């Protein structure tokens, strides 16, 4: 009977008997499938009927044999198919809600027309809500009563977040709305002024300066805020006392170490083969331009540490007496005074370095020590500083430019062989040379060499050291 083709096959009675047979049959073990449920193939679309009827004089079966799973499925468009698909959508597990970035506070459409109350401008009613261009939802218009209530409740019930470090106070301390006067909310030009405005920096709403809402939270914060310790001003801030004169705490030890470092620096430069082929005048041009930077690299390599003390500035009476003594004594130089912690040296004899200038030297030394620069890396950095093609008065520019480029190439190859991150190490080493721009050569001369050489200029001393054997 199962293999025969009966004439009532496809009728309602045949389908009911076949369904009862499949229901009372012993359930078979479900096979493991790659897909949870099969929803038929394209055979269910032919013929496309919405109701069970007679298409072309022939009965249309409610079920069809699937080409994928081999089972019977209801035809698409039939009543049975619609019932099954609607039941599937009803009992399907709800999807997890997507994570939203935060509440949307509308677009610029809420400002047109800018009204403070809901009224009839121009004889047309203004809707309290508008459709947002970003999220597609309805938001209250800015300046309306509903908008003010929502923004006020948002600021009241939201948990206070930790304040971020800002360079100049809170966002509402900006002068963006300071040009709008008025301590009370009024109607300038017949229009009501909104209590809040949209900030251009953070995109949030803040109360206007001068309004009652602005004065209330600011006064509360000022009354209840705990006194915090103000951060120290940086060394380049002239208003924090960074221009106060300082001197070495142990001048004899530090000056001797600096003199030894200068001798080693000039010995390193003088006996370079590529430097010896230059004329004496070109050698002098290069050394006079970069001796201070080369000395700083040498002091960093020797790990020279020094301390300074503050000295008092000379009074007007001391300046007058010093000038009169020099006029009466002729051109005889003043004796070098013994540097004591709080004894002011004569202002005409030398300019005492300031605390900010000395701090720039210490910052450079600390930067070099933090990188643990090797001896070869110090030598390549010295070569980069020495062969500077931008020095004024230099004639062999192409030759010096080639030497600097070759030194940088050797340094790059060395860092690639000794470190895994070649570009990071190479950039860090060259970044130390940028700090040398904040160090003045006259400050180094006054701090380390003036107590020893007196009134002799550093240029004359460089010429003497280049001409003599050291």
Swiss-Prot record:
It comes from the Eukaryota. SUPFAM superfamilies: Nuclear receptor ligand-binding domain. A motif (AF-2 motif) lies at residues 461-466. Residues 205-469 form the NR LBD domain. GO terms for cellular component: cytoplasm; membrane; nucleoplasm; nucleus; ribosome. Homodimerization involved an interaction between amino and carboxy termini involving LXXLL motifs and steroid binding domain (AF-2 motif). Heterodimerizes with NR5A1 and NROB2 through its N-terminal LXXLL motifs. Belongs to the nuclear hormone receptor family. NR0 subfamily. This is Nuclear receptor subfamily 0 group B member 1. The gene is NR0B1.
């Amino acid at each position: 009977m199962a293999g025969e083709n009966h004439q009532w096959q496809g009728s309602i009675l045949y389908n009911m008997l076949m369904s009862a047979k499949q229901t009372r049959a012993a359930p078979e073990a479900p096979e493991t499938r790659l897909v949870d449920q099969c929803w038929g193939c394209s055979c269910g679309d032919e013929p496309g009927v919405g109701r069970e009827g007679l298409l072309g004089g022939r009965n249309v079966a409610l079920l069809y044999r699937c080409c994928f799973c081999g089972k019977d499925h209801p035809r698409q468009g039939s009543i049975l198919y619609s019932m099954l698909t609607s039941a599937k959508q009803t009992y399907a597990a709800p999807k997890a809600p997507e994570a939203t970035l935060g509440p949307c506070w509308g677009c610029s459409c809420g400002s047109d027309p800018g009204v403070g109350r809901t009224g009839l401008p121009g004889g047309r009613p203004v809707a309290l809500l508008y459709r947002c261009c970003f999220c597609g939802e309805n938001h209250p218009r800015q300046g309306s009563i509903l908008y003010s209530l929502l923004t006020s409740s948002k600021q009241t019930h939201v948990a206070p977040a930790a304040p971020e470090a800002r360079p100049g106070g809170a966002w509402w301390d900006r002068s963006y709305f300071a040009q709008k006067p008025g301590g009370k909310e009024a109607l300038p030009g017949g229009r009501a002024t909104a209590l809040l405005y949209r900030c251009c920096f953070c995109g949030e709403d803040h109360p206007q300066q001068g309004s009652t809402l602005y004065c209330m939270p600011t006064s509360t914060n000022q009354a209840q805020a705990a006194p915090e310790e103000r951060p120290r001003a940086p060394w380049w801030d002239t208003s924090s006392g960074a221009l106060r004169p300082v001197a070495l705490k142990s001048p004899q030890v530090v000056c001797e170490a600096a003199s030894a470092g200068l001798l080693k620096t000039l010995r390193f430069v003088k006996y370079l083969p590529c430097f010896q082929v230059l004329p004496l005048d070109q050698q002098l041009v290069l050394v006079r331009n970069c001796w201070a930077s080369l000395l700083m690299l040498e002091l960093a390599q020797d790990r020279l540490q020094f301390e300074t003390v503050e000295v008092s500035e000379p009074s007007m009476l001391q300046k007058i007496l010093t000038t009169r003594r020099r006029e009466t004594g002729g051109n005889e130089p003043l004796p070098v005074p013994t540097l004591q912690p709080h004894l002011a040296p004569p202002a005409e004899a030398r300019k005492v370095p300031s605390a900010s200038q000395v701090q720039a030297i210490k910052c450079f030394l600390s930067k070099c020590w933090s990188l643990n620069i090797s001896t070869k890396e110090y030598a390549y950095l010295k070569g980069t500083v020495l062969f500077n093609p931008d020095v004024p008065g230099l004639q062999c520019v192409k030759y010096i430019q080639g030497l600097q480029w070759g030194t940088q190439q050797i340094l790059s190859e060395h860092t690639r062989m000794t470190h895994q991150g070649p570009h990071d190490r190479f950039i860090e080493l060259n970044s130390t040379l940028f700090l040398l721009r904040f160090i003045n050569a006259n400050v180094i001369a006054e701090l380390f060499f003036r107590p020893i050489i007196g009134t002799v200029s550093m240029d004359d001393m460089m010429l003497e050291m280049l001409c003599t054997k050291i």
